[in-house]
């Protein structure tokens, strides 16, 4: 029990630390967390029907899933109405989205007439009026027909109570004037129409955005003739007070601010964006600058200075960066590098506009769309840091620049209405004209002109087409009671319902029988003084308690539970003898104290009956070796732990004997394609042979026995490169070889790391008490504990007692407090052994067990089944060009034709004649016999090898 209380105290300390972090602002603020009272008023009349009402419930579930439900965040209430309103879900009834979803799905359809005004008044009186939270209050009215009572007075009363009203009309039976009377102004923001209930899903995202704007963007920015929800960042950072110098933009009487490096434009984010930002918004800024460095026009930082959202201008690369949060890795950066972005750095006035949605961000410069980039889903922002404008990236130094406008609009549609009229020389459309810094433009009011002259009478028109069928009439009165129907077939059992509300406190139960003696109690605080109790039975001697810190003298009270060990206190004066305290827990070994006085010898107690066998205790700390005890009974086998992480390679074991062939295993998965083998060394030059005829497929050879692996040989000398042989023909595909015998058993691996702790097993039966062992020597001094203040310990233990005492009292371990009395009575007669008590609550997880002994070598596993046929190998490299010897010279040609007879008279020798023409080609000679083996010319071999490049594709010339 003491360990259990200590464990709970440690857990509470950690929870207190975490709660401090949460209170310091470590909560992401967004629409999900903005505190809001949100009430849905649903039409449940006859015209809706059960099927359409189910569609409405699914739509309501999809809307509320976007919010965090709880007392600190959004609370949802639901009212269904027909002839009368019904409170289906009160505000604050559920603290989680799952419970709220289950409650919405369990709402039953009413049916009846349409009394919308009565339902609005009911929500005002019984939901909003009973909410004690001073925050945003929103009501959404969904109806499909004209109300049968007045709605104006009830809606006006709700608006007077600062309740924002949305009206959703479904179908053609709704009246536009009635919906406008219900909703807030302007109706373009607070009134929605859909053609039927199936189409209601089309306005889900728009409705979610509008609800978000109401809860996150409470302020309004004057824009032309209407006020837009959003944030004027210049106003939120008090720029008009911090920056004294104003500048004139143009003759249009538009003024701006000249920011210097001496001004610090920073403010706490919680003051500027108290509830964070909506998921979709429009960022607009108008500025002029000359700086050529990287700086942040606007940024929201965490408490440790990390940017969450930022608009960064890179004057070096002339690009724009947008930083925002991300659910993937916390942050994401989008780069706009379009050539048109460079115009921002020409030292002139320009407007930057970023349309940020949940899917993407779009950049506009001077009212022209530049680029669109996708976004990952975003997170809410942390509001415990600062919001700044005009700072160098990563620094606190202010940039010198001029600024005229810096705003965030919560409505994405404002992107279509925004203009850049404040920029000098802007040629775009300016419907409402520019506005001055800090001024509110007046709406344009134009008086109507004079009536024109009456026109001539027109010709008679053609007969009109037949009209459309008339609209359905109003809901009829309830019909007469019908004849009782036959009993239906028993339905199938329904699904288990949601958990019910806590029941009322029951009547006090009768006094129970006296139970078995309980375990020693846990430490408690000093109680109030009580009346003197009756003489109780003498209790057993308890174990000594911890030495507590000396406390202030208090009033006399009843004996409390033993206290927790406290730090050693200063030596105090000798006080009076106190009352005998309750037995405490065994304390840690302390320093030897002064010899005490001899106490009186106690009376010997009556031997008790042998008790039942106790439960297995928790593992204690390792003490010094004790005396050899008796052999204990074998323990219960533990649960199988999870696989440990792979151990380090073990030392190679001795070669085992050859095992028997294993049983044929299951087919293994197809193996991966192997890497190409290394290129072999060139062989010796071969003879020049003729291409041989492809041989027949050979018979399948027998599987040879596996040889013993030889020792690694020494590296041989590098041989002379051989001549490349001619490329051979592709051989026929060989048959699949037989299965090999199983391999030799591998060496025993080293011991793996300890497995993950197993789950706590069920409590075993109560065992017999063992023989008491000899008392061991005192343990070593423990490490000094962490210092906690006495007030902190009291607070933690008070919380523990409040939370755990009712559970312990109901668990059956403590039936009464007879054993807590401190008076000594006469020893009672030992009672018979009590029955085995009920199974106790599940204990805390046990301490990790010792590392197990390495197991024996397992039996060799079955060999895997032969793998699937591998993919065809790569084509081999083309061989180098072969060479042959020149052929033998052919035989001489036949003699030419006989010339004409010469002159008989001998003349002088003539000049040499011209060379004769080549004779006809002779027939090829007969193939000669192969010559003897040639001798390789080293120069020729080198040239062949040099031409052979294994990485060259194509022939080698």
UniProtKB/Swiss-Prot annotation:
Residue ranges occupied by any Laminin G-like domain in the UniProt entry: 230-412
Cross-referenced InterPro entries: Collagen, Collagen_Structural_Proteins, ConA-like_dom_sf, TSPN-like_N, VWF_A, vWFA_dom_sf
Composition bias type Low complexity, residue spans: 451-462, 471-481, 618-637, 705-729, 839-874
Induction: Stimulated by PDGF/platelet-derived growth factor.
One Pfam family cited in the UniProt record for this chain: VWA
Region of interest: Disordered: 448-786, 825-938
Stretches assigned to the Collagen-like domain: 448-500, 501-542, 543-594, 681-733, 734-787, 825-882, 884-934
Organism name: Homo sapiens (Human)
Keyword annotations from UniProtKB, A to Z: Collagen, Cytoplasm, Extracellular matrix, Glycoprotein, Repeat, Secreted, Signal
UniProt similarity note: Belongs to the fibril-associated collagens with interrupted helices (FACIT) family.
Cytoplasm among keywords: yes
Record GO cellular component, one term: endoplasmic reticulum lumen
Localization: Secreted, Extracellular space, Extracellular matrix; Cytoplasm
Record: glycosylation sites: 62
Amino acid composition bias (Basic and acidic residues), ranges on this chain: 507-517, 732-742
Protein name as it appears in the record: Collagen alpha-1(XXI) chain
Start and end residues of each VWFA domain: 37-211
Gene3D superfamilies: 2.60.120.200, 6-Phosphogluconate Dehydrogenase, domain 3, von Willebrand factor, type A domain
Keyword check for Chaperone: no
Expression (tissue specificity): Highly expressed in lymph node, jejunum, pancreas, stomach, trachea, testis, uterus and placenta; moderately expressed in brain, colon, lung, prostate, spinal cord, salivary gland and vascular smooth-muscle cells and very weakly expressed in heart, liver, kidney, bone marrow, spleen, thymus, skeletal muscle, adrenal gland and peripheral leukocytes. Expression in heart was higher in the right ventricle and atrium than in the left ventricle and atrium.
């Amino acid at each position: 029990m003491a360990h259990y209380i200590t464990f709970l105290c440690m857990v509470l300390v950690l929870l207190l630390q975490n709660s401090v972090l949460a209170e310091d602002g470590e909560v992401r603020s967004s629409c999900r967390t903005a505190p809001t009272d949100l009430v849905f008023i649903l039409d449940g009349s006859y015209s809706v029907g059960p099927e359409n009402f189910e569609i409405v419930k699914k739509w309501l579930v999809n809307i509320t899933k976007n919010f965090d439900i709880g007392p600190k965040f959004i609370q949802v209430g639901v009212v269904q109405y027909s002839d009368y309103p019904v409170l289906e879900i009160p505000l604050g009834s559920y603290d989680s989205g799952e419970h709220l979803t289950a409650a919405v799905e369990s709402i039953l359809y009413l049916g009846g007439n349409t009394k919308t005004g009565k339902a609005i008044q009911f929500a005002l009186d019984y939901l909003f009026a009973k909410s004690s939270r001073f925050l945003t209050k929103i009501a959404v009215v969904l109806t499909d027909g004209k109300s049968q009572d007045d709605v104006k007075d009830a809606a006006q009363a709700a608006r007077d109570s600062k309740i924002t009203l949305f009206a959703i009309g479904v179908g053609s039976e709704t009246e536009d004037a009635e919906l406008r009377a219900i909703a807030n102004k302007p109706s373009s923001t607070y009134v929605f129409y859909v053609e039927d209930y199936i189409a209601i899903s089309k306005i889900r995202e728009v409705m979610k955005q509008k609800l978000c704007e109401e809860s996150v963007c409470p302020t309004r920015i004057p824009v032309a003739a209407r006020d837009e929800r959003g944030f004027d960042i210049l106003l939120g950072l008090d720029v008009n007070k911090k920056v004294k110098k104003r500048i004139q933009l143009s003759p249009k009487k538009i003024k701006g601010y000249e920011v210097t490096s001496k001004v610090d434009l920073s403010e706490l984010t919680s003051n500027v964006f108290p509830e964070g930002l909506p998921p979709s918004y429009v960022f607009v800024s108008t500025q002029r600058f000359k700086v050529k460095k990287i700086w942040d026009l606007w940024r929201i930082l965490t408490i440790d200075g990390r940017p969450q959202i930022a608009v960064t201008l890179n004057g070096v690369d002339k690009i724009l960066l947008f930083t925002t949060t991300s659910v993937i890795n916390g942050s994401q950066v989008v780069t706009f590098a379009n050539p048109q972005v460079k115009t921002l750095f020409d030292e002139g006035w320009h407007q930057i506009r970023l349309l940020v949605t949940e899917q993407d961000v779009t950049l506009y410069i001077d009212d022209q769309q530049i680029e669109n980039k996708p976004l990952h889903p975003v997170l809410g922002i942390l509001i415990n840091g600062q919001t700044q404008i005009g700072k160098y990236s990563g620094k606190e130094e202010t940039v010198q620049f001029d600024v005229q406008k810096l705003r965030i609009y919560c409505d994405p549609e404002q992107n279509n209405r925004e203009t850049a009229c404040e920029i000098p020389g802007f040629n775009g459309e300016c419907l409402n004209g520019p506005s001055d810094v800090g001024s509110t433009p007046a709406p344009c009011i134009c008086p109507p002109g004079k009536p024109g002259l009456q026109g001539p009478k027109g010709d008679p028109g053609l007969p009109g087409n037949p009209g459309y069928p008339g609209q359905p009439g109003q809901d009829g009165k309830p019909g007469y009671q019908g004849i009782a129907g036959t009993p239906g077939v028993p339905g199938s059992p329904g699904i288990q319902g949601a958990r019910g509300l806590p029941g009322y406190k029951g009547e006090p139960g009768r006094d129970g029988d006296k139970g078995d003696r309980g375990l020693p109690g846990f430490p408690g605080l000093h109680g109030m003084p009580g009346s003197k109790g009756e003489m109780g039975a003498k209790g057993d001697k308890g174990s000594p308690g911890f030495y507590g810190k000396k406390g202030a003298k208090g009033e006399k009270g009843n004996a409390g539970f033993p206290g927790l060990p406290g730090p050693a206190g200063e030596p105090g004066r000798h006080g009076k003898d106190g009352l005998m305290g309750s037995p405490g827990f065994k304390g840690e070994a302390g320093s030897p104290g002064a010899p005490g006085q001899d106490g009186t010898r106690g009376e010997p107690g009556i031997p008790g009956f042998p008790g039942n066998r106790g439960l297995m205790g928790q593992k204690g700390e390792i003490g010094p070796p004790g005396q050899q005890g008796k052999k204990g009974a074998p323990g219960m086998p533990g649960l199988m732990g999870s696989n440990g992480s792979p151990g380090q390679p073990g030392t190679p074991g001795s070669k085992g004997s050859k095992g028997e062939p294993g049983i044929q295993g299951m087919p293994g998965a197809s193996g991966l394609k192997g890497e190409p083998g290394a290129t072999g060394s060139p062989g010796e030059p071969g003879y020049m042979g003729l291409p041989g005829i492809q041989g027949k497929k050979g018979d399948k050879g027998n599987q040879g026995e596996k040889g013993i692996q030889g020792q690694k040989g020494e590296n041989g000398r590098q041989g002379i490169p051989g001549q490349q042989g001619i490329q051979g023909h592709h051989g026929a595909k060989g048959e699949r070889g037989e299965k090999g015998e199983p391999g030799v058993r591998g060496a025993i691996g080293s011991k793996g790391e300890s497995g993950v702790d197993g789950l706590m097993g069920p409590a075993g039966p109560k065992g017999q008490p063992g023989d008491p062992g000899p008392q061991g020597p005192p343990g070593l001094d423990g490490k000094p504990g962490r210092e906690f203040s006495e007030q902190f310990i009291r607070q933690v233990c008070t919380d523990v007692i409040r939370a755990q005492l009712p559970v312990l009292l109901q668990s059956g371990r403590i039936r009464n407090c007879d054993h807590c009395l401190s008076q000594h009575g006469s020893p009672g007669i030992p009672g018979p052994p009590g029955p085995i008590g009920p199974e106790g609550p599940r204990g805390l997880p046990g301490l990790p067990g010792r590392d197990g002994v390495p197991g024996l070598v397992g039996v060799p596993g079955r060999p895997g089944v032969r793998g699937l046929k591998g993919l065809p190998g790569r084509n081999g490299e083309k061989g180098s060009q072969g060479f042959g010897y020149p052929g033998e010279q052919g035989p001489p040609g036949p003699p030419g034709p006989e010339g004409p007879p010469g002159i008989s008279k001998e003349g002088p020798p003539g000049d040499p004649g011209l060379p004769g023409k080549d004779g006809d080609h002779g027939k090829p000679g007969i193939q000669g016999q192969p010559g003897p083996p040639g001798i390789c010319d080293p120069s020729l071999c080198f040239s062949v090898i040099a031409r052979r490049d294994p990485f060259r594709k194509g022939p080698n010339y």
